[in-house]
């Protein structure tokens, strides 16, 4: 299984060689997770259990980020609950952990983990009680036998989007379906929600789930002209999706994110045909696949290389790069 790792010499060398001159001094993280081991359900991703700490709070996150981005200051961002499949008391505990971290640091905003069966008025009351400013939905909560093919309303019902509009919340959406943002159903619901509820800010996770960049290249044109639509680029390691966002939606609607702790796994995601595959440090024997030495580095570094190449291809200025790393999120985040 992949493990949440500490920095290696290969990680440090790559950052110094390729990224130190690109990453601004101050960053904001639009997609990161906090959790406690006791909040993980029995079927939770084992990588979350492999960390040394029992509770991954902002202090633990900052220690890890100092390894990924040496010399940089993380000024704030959006906190998402980490145990996205949690239920019952574990789910409540997740949301309360996020709320405590938000209350202790003005630079951060937090999301409430929601399930489609939650009454919208319960969602409204909990967001207010906990001092949160966003919602986090996830397809595993859809109730569908095959959650990877769920329609957006199956795990993000319109009644909850209406609450987000009325409370001026942001929503982080990790869409599914085989072709992601190129799927007509996903396009329909994203546009419908954004146009019907303009005071809701919708963030499409992972470059509109552009793990296969051709889905983003082919699908994002259908979502032009939505001022409350954003994309964050966490954990995307193939070139193309970030360029499509900048080209079709504008650099001012692209957000930097890490998807911590995924940022601290070693490997990358690779487009294959009309899909994609994740290759981690334990997926295959890296010592035997090439005539030369191959050593995977942090996913978070691979995604930064992709963002750097997108900025270069789109001829972004330094100030536009700084927008992606922090300023755009400052414009989006609501108090």
Residue ranges and their predicted role:
Residues 28-32, 76-80, 109-112, 133-137, ...:
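Hydrophobic faces of well-ordered beta-strands that scaffold small-molecule active sites
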Residues 1-82, 89-90:
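An N-terminally biased module of ancient metal coordination in phosphate/nucleic-acid-related enzymes
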Residues 13, 57-65, 94-96, 119-122, ...:
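Alpha-helical scaffolding within the catalytic cores
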Residues 160, 180-194, 205-209:
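Active-site cradle of extracellular carbohydrate-active enzymes
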Residues 33-38, 84-87, 117-119, 141-144, ...:
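Active-site environment of divalent metal-dependent phosphoester hydrolases
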Residues 2-13, 207-335:
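H/E-rich (His + Asp/Glu) clusters that bind or coordinate divalent metals
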Residues 2-10, 89-179, 229, 245:
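Active-site gating/metal-coordination segments in enzymes
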Residues 38-43, 91, 123-124, 147-149, ...:
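Short aromatic-enriched loop/helix-cap "lid" or pocket-rim segments at secondary-structure transitions
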């Amino acid at each position: 299984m992949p493990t949440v790792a500490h920095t290696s010499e290969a990680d440090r060398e790559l950052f110094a060689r390729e990224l130190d001159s690109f990453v601004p001094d101050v960053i904001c993280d639009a997609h990161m997770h906090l959790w406690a081991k006791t909040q993980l359900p029995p079927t939770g991703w084992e990588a979350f259990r492999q960390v040394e700490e029992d509770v991954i709070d902002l202090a633990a996150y900052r220690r890890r980020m100092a390894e990924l981005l040496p010399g940089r200051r993380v000024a704030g961002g959006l906190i998402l609950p980490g145990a996205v499949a949690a239920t019952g008391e574990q789910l409540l505990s997740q949301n309360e952990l996020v709320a405590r971290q938000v209350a202790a640091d003005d630079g951060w905003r937090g999301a409430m983990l929601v399930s489609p069966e939650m009454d919208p008025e319960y969602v409204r009351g909990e967001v207010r009680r906990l001092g949160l400013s966003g919602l986090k939905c996830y397809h595993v909560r859809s109730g569908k036998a095959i959650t990877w093919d769920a329609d957006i309303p199956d795990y993000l019902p319109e009644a909850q989007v209406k609450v987000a509009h009325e409370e001026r919340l942001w929503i982080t959406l990790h869409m599914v379906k085989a072709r992601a943002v190129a799927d007509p159903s996903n396009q329909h619901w994203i546009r419908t929600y954004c146009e019907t509820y303009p005071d809701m800010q919708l963030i499409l996770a992972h470059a509109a789930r552009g793990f296969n960049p051709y889905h983003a290249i082919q699908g994002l044109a259908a979502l032009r002209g939505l001022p409350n639509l954003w994309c964050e680029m966490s954990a995307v390691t193939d070139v193309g999706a970030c360029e499509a966002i900048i080209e079709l939606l504008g650099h001012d609607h692209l957000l930097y994110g890490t998807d911590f702790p995924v940022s601290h796994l070693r490997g990358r995601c690779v487009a294959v045909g009309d899909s994609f595959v994740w290759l981690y440090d334990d997926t295959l024997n890296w010592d035997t696949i090439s005539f030369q030495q191959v050593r995977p580095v942090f996913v978070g570094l691979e995604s930064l290389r992709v963002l750097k190449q997108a900025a270069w291809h789109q001829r972004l200025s330094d100030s536009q790069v700084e927008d992606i790393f922090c300023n755009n999120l400052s414009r989006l985040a609501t108090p």
